Amino acid sequence: MKSQNQNLLVAVAIWLACMFGLYLFFPERIGAGKRAPQQKPEAPAQAPVTTAPAPPAGPVGSGATVASKAADVPRGTPGPKPPLRTVTFETPRVRVVATSEGAAIQSVQLLGEKWTRHKGTKEESQIDLVSPRASEALPFTTVVTGTDGKALVTATTAYALVKSDATSATFRAEEGGVTISKTFSVNPEHYGISLLVELKAAQGISGQLSILSGTHAEEPQGGFFAPHTSTPARTICAAGNNNVERLAIGAKHPVFEAPSAQFAGIDEEYFLSAVMPPAGVPASCRLEAHGEKSGSLIASLTVPVQVAAGGDSQLLFQGYAGPKDESELMAVAKPLKQSIDLGFWAVIAELLLGIMKFFYRVVPPHNWGVAIILLTLAMKVLTFPLQHKSMKSMQEMQRIQPQLEELKKKYAGDTQRQNLEQMKLFKEHGVNPMGSCLPMLIQMPIWFALYKTLQVSVELYNAHFIRGWIEDLTSKDPYYILPVAMGITMILTQVLTPAPMSNPSQKTMGYAMSGFFSLLMLTLPSGLTLYIFTNNILSIAQQMYLRRKLRPPPVKASGQTVEVDKKKDDRSGGSGGASGRAKIRA
């Protein structure tokens, strides 16, 4: 039947959209740069604040040409190089190591059981937001250039440690006729790191100051069935007007510049290292991606600087190094919230995350897997009226199948008339030919939005469902139990759906699509698979309930007129009337 074929084509199109939609709408999961493997930083030899000598730094790599506009020029005859010193700050949230080499941040290690990479493996380690191979541009590396482009202070300037305490450290250097002091301060109440830069020059300065951040990245990895395990690393710049740009290794255009910027830094999907300009000071940003197979990602935030002869200038930069938790970002600065990229499905994703947060907060045992199950139940309750209407329409479609077949035979040579009569029949019986597709059309945006939520929301990072089985809802099911169970429930759902599938090949195709969809889910987040599996279970229960509720009432025998064929009645010895009809009452 034509309507059946149309429904089949629509169903196939929808399933294909499900299969390819994740990769169409979210290419960055497969195409983004991958962070280099983390190395465990050495624990401080002393208490939270240390000033320990370190071995001489090796030669600076090609990435030392950060901020390409600020060319590195000879510095003349340098004075004695001060010893390399490090200072360690430790708060309840982070362990920060500052180095005198360039007066930059050498390590930002997030503390707590949640903040680990490769959890449950031999490579498990605390998350460090500074790449061990980012020596070309450690966070808060500073470059000062004059109006002629000459570098007055370079990225590799050697600083001396002047003073330090439990939450701050000051480094100082003299180079190119400029005295520069950099004071780092950490706040135990949040993930903020502030940097106060003080410049002095006997002959004055007119130019610009750039704060740099870099990381090592590799070329995009993975394919169609790539595991959901990579951690993308990209440079990021909030260029104003809610325009946030990101740049990864392998980008078509390896350089991005914006004349205005609210912050710039390194975005690792769940984590952010960024710096913001001083209040009221205009800033620009520049993002760079060096290398083809692997290389450096460098972000720079540049502000104008003006120092009168014999005078000084102070600039206070606010930085952030931590998880992209909305409340934590807002505690430091509101613009940082723009780093949370929920993409095309942002409105739905924010709603889903809000519902899950509510369930996680109020329902014991405060488990994100349970929150996903309750989210599924809530969505099912909200869509129940539509599901009810859809199933009623499908059951009515089954009941009028004989009439549709008669119309098909009657108007076999007139397709236009056949379609017209079918539509009249649908209208007469309140049947919507597309009714069976509506529930799935509603679920698809939820699937895509939930996938993006799992991909971005740090609340779900390393969030377990059942210990020993699913330790991270943002990663695949390590034992593939959920994808297999999901495939079985999808087949059961098709069996119970009252769709007119008289053609065996159509049923076979439906089962094959369920199997292929399960195969697709093998490498996708277990949280998404848990949602679809729970939705299938609820759909099975709902269909069983609606089949009983919408079951047509039995035909009553009382008062029914039965037509009796006169010839058959005569042969059986009955006494038929002249009209050949008899009324039989129960």
Positions of the model-derived regions?
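Membrane-protein biogenesis/insertion across secretory and organellar systems
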Residues: 1-381, 553-586
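Membrane-interface amphipathic helices and adjacent TM-edge segments
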Residues: 5, 310, 381-447, 491-522, ...
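Core hydrophobic alpha-helical membrane-spanning segments
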Residues: 11-23, 447-450, 484-489, 515-516
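Alpha-helical membrane-interface segments at transmembrane helix boundaries
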Residues: 356-364, 426-430, 434, 470, ...
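Conserved catalytic motifs of ABC-family nucleotide-binding domains
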Residues: 449-490
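Hydrophobic core segments of alpha-helical transmembrane domains in multi-pass membrane proteins
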Residues: 486-487, 527-536
